[in-house]
Amino acid sequence: MMQYFHWYIDPNLILWNDVKTKAQELADAGFTALWLPPAYKGMGGTYDVGYAVYDMYDLGEFDQHGTVRTKYGTREQYLAAINALHASGIQVYGDTVLNHRMGGEGTEIARATPFNEYDRLHPKGWTRDIKAYTHFKFPGRQGKYSNFEWHWWHFDAVDYDDFTKEPNTLYLFEGKTFDDYVALEKGNFAYLMGCDLDFQSQDVRDEVTRWGKWYLDTTGADGFRLDAIKHISSWFFPQWLDEMRYHAGKDLFVVGEYWLNNIDTLHWYINAVNGKMSVFDVPLHYNFYYASRSGGHYDMGSILNGTLMQQRPTHAVTFVENHDSQPLQSLEAPVEPWFKPLAYAIILLRREGYPCVFYADYYGTEYEDYGKDGNRYKIFLPSHRWIIDKLLYARKQYAYGDQYDYFDHYNTIGWTRLGDHAHPKAMAVIMSDSVPGYKWMEVGKPNAKFYDLTEHIKEPIYTNEWGWAEFRCNGGSVSVWVQE
């Protein structure tokens, strides 16, 4: 799949029109699904990436928060893009933010207990009245699609009191508790931002279910990318996903974002949701990140250690970069450009995991923003489309059959794919994070000629009578040897 956006997409692009025109081109390249950004109105209007959720029923149809369209276009353009993707044989996964709401029109006075933002286990004051923007009336929509309005009692907590305007403080509403079965950072990580939905409320669960069915009926989407799942009670999702799949009448693909570099916690979460969704392989991303910044001193033989790709491949969505890890973003941990061809070879040419290509890695981009140090930076991310297209071709033509691994060297690793009945030609992948490398590997094809699909090495390689050969790669590079 491709994540078809990054944080700094220009609103003038009209992303929905852009993807509509490129649907067949993407299919021809080898993409079978796109993860599209949040399609509903955010409190930031035209400039909202989609995660400051305001009205999930407004797909760019109503004049709310200063705009009819979203950052990516109008409802009609969104639906036309989905239709074009489906016509090209590409599935669509909708980015879905269920955790919070932001940008309410009306204030309400309610009793709440203050907590330090960084310690959700111990109150820092007495329960008192606060004034919060917790009434969501959606005046621009005027009850179309849903007449549900959000009030303070639908939320657990907020982070703003209009009476005191005290910073770094959360306010837990009286009679509420922070949701259980969530991440344990800060004592309890149920609260992330805005008005935090109370998933212990039946009214909230019913409304989220109604919206999910409406969204599927409206868009015909083939699955969900679920945002910020570590902030939502894990017990909520199995039943919700069952209802969504039953309503859609198809086996919707679902991947959740649980951002934590801890394989044991990801195993716990997958078990907690009864294996009903995949999750992003965050530990693999961090392995790529550290390898790319180690100057050739990373143990490449351990690149898959502690990852879902290695330990739970059927539930792993593998990725190199995303909109949160890209430079200047909240979870900034960018993989260095020189290493990205190696990382993409790992996720695209092995049999484990469901790989996700990042828009900015494919097309490249430039943008400016402020860093965490307060300084403004200009960022240039180069396009890796040429090499990714080569890898996608190799995946489609050669990544079949038995896989033999040669993760037996500190710098140079490789693996081979022997092909199957329908795809009889073999492939050998070799990479090094340091000096040029070579490796004796079996491809099961005696006396066969192999050439480097990446064109990094021009001379062909021939296997011996037992189907083995010494395959080579340049330093800090990857070569993909395919049978002629």
Predicted segments, located by residue:
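Boundary/entry segment of secreted carbohydrate-active catalytic domains
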Residues: 1-14, 191-197
